[in-house]
């Protein structure tokens, strides 16, 4: 029985040249939040620590301004 081989995830931001993450780029930020509005951890996305911190800061900034929701729906 062969063991399951998990491929190493690559950091998208370091591969593109290490650009700064902008809080106004909603399409990019939506890739890193779940359907319920939570920030996806770096062990799942494969982002480096430096860029994960920038992502979290940008997502929180976009939430504060109102570009992203804090959660999916209020009941």
UniProtKB/Swiss-Prot annotation:
Belongs to the bacterial ribosomal protein bS18 family. PROSITE patterns: RIBOSOMAL_S18. NCBIfam families: S18. This is Small ribosomal subunit protein bS18. GO terms for biological process: translation. It comes from the Bacteria. Binds as a heterodimer with protein bS6 to the central domain of the 16S rRNA, where it helps stabilize the platform of the 30S subunit. Part of the 30S ribosomal subunit. Forms a tight heterodimer with protein bS6. Keywords: Ribonucleoprotein, Ribosomal protein, RNA-binding, rRNA-binding. GO terms for molecular function: small ribosomal subunit rRNA binding; structural constituent of ribosome. One of its GO terms (cellular component) is cytosolic small ribosomal subunit. The keyword Manganese does not apply. The lineage of its organism: Bacteria, Pseudomonadati, Pseudomonadota, Gammaproteobacteria, Legionellales.
